[in-house]
Each structure stands twice: as structure tokens, then as C-alpha cells.
Amino acid sequence: MTRKVTGKALNGALLEEVGLDHEVVHLAIEQTYNLLDKVDATLVAEGVFPLSQTVELANLSSMIGNIFASALANHSNGRFKRNGPHKYPDLLSADTKAYPDLELKMALERNKPKGHLAKPGYYITCRYVLCNTQGEPMFEKGNRGVTPYIWELRCGYLGEEHFAISNTEGDSGKTAVVNKEGMIALKVVFLDIDRAPLSQKGKVFAEYVSLLEAGD
């Protein structure tokens, strides 16, 4: 059975400026869930753990991102096509005068999205959580769920100033993490608040509630 996409669509005008809309996003999330569930079902049938328990979380994020980017292109009515693996940006615009190329960045739970270089451009950031088989989120480190659900999508333009550069010894090479100002510059376009990895008594959760109450 296909998983239902739950969540609130926001900032539709911003999505339209970059060549997308809420229907495209909804269908892309749905296709991503459907494919991930098929992969998990095949793995389990062969006596293998689900994908989220078979690969490291960094690799899982990359896999989900690649699937979601392809799904966005599939449902974009020809406005975008998927770029090759490990190539920037992820989504190539069919008409750059009408709407820009888009880069997709993934992150688990409340982590800030990151890449290897601080490249100015238009971004979609996707943050997800791991839930149990009933779709209930499990955030405890070492006791996370097995099924990925997207809880937040953001969209907007990022400049070099919106990244924090790290090149410390022991790090996984040079990294560029979206900083606080960058997260503010990116506007929420999809929010599944019931699966947000936040304390419902906290300030951040209250800010998300206010965002939902304000509407699109």
C-alpha cells in the first residue's frame, strides 16, 4: 500500500518562482516513499535488513536525495532534468531564463544540510526522520526507526555567506554547512509537524506552529 504524504504546503509563490509547485512536490515525495518501500520490501523478503539498517546514515541521506531529486524532475512537466551523479547542480533547468537550476541538500532530523563547497545558487533542502513501521517518529540516537519520512522542505537562494566552512583534521574533507542565516534565508515550503524532531514545549516548535497558522 502506498504511503500517504502528510504535511502542510507553504510558500507556494516561492516554489513557482523556481519552476515548481506544491503538486510536483507532493507527487515527488509520494514517488520517493513508494520506491523506498519497494526496496525495503525486496530486502526484507531476501532476509536482509531494511535500507536504513543496511547502510550508514550518510549514505542513506545520499540515496534518498538522489531518488527525491529524480522524482522532482520526473514530475516537473519537463522543466527540469536530473544531472549526472556527483555533478552540480542536481536539477538542470530546461529554460534558465524562466527558472534557475536547483541543488538539493539532505539532512537527518534537525541537522543543517551541508556539502563540500559553498556554491551560490538556488537550493532545496530536505530534512527527514526515521519512523517505526506505523509512521511514528523515533529520534533517540541508537534507537531510531527504520522508515524514512520527510518532515521539512525549504527553498531559496544561498550565497557564499550562508555557509560555514570547515576543514578541520579528522573531518570528512572540506565541508560547507548551511549556517543560521542560511536557514533563515531558506523558506519552509513543506512541513510535516507531527513528525518534526522537536520538543512540543520548545520555542522552535512554537515557531513552526505559528508558521502553519499564518498559512501560505
Question: What feature does the model see in each segment?
Answer:
Residues 1-89, 106-216:
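Nucleic-acid endonuclease domains
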Residues 92-101:
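Active-site beta-strand-loop-beta-strand hairpin of nuclease catalytic cores
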